[in-house]
Amino acid sequence: MVKPKIGIFGLTGCAGEQIVILNCEDQLIDILDAIDIRYFPTAMTKNDDKCELDIAFVEGAVVQPEDEELLKKIRQRSKLLIAIGTCAVWGGLPAMRNDVQREEFLEKVYGTKGKSFKSIPAQPLNNFIKVDLSISGCPIEKEQFLKAVTYLLHGDPPLLPSYAVCTECKMNEYVCMLVGKNKLCLGPITMAGCGARCPGYNIPCIGCRGPVDEANVASEVKILKEKGFTLRDIENRLRSFAAQAEILQEQFKKE
């Protein structure tokens, strides 16, 4: 039986998703019996950067012209391309202030030396190529990566959460951070899958997994305003991880 060829790539980011994959440890060893990893520079010294791939996992945002060039090459050689991590899916932290001219950032940080930088506003992968599946998270949950690989090996799309973090809070019987503790919590509009980890430690959800489908952002903002949070604080929180999401962009235009 021919093993599916897999590639694991990183664009501009922290490599958090690749570390999560390595931390799968025992489970990863079991998976290696069923797949042929041909490209994974974080874990391997010998990598094939030309072979055709059955599945490519790509983390990181497109922040440089070289990122875009590499991404398009990966797409051309891959049957399936999976975006992993919030940077790849939404643009992540690097894209939080794309509304500000990049030249202004570069000048403030690097002075005149910033003029030589070739970086571009950070963008998610699907702004450049077709993405077959997105697994969000900062970083991703290793269980979701393992599930995705297992399902894809059987030719099926993995079943990922399609509900909000609030649902996981209720399942865990946590006190609501928004209503019960009056915290600036984005749980009602954030994609689940983390097990409501932050609320479990008495920390409000900061939206690191990006917005859930059909999130009612306007109602979330209205509730937060009524609780005394300033529009600036609310917008800064919303921009932190998924500022490029269309549903959030629509809200920013209203304010």
PLM feature segments, named:
Residues 97:
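Portal/gating segments that form or line small-molecule/metal binding sites
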Residues 1-57, 62, 66-80, 103-255:
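Iron-sulfur (Fe-S) cluster-binding modules
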Residues 100:
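Short beta-strand elements at the ligand-binding edges of bilobed clamshell
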Residues 87-92:
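Short gly/pro/ser/thr-enriched loop/turn and capping motifs at secondary-structure boundaries
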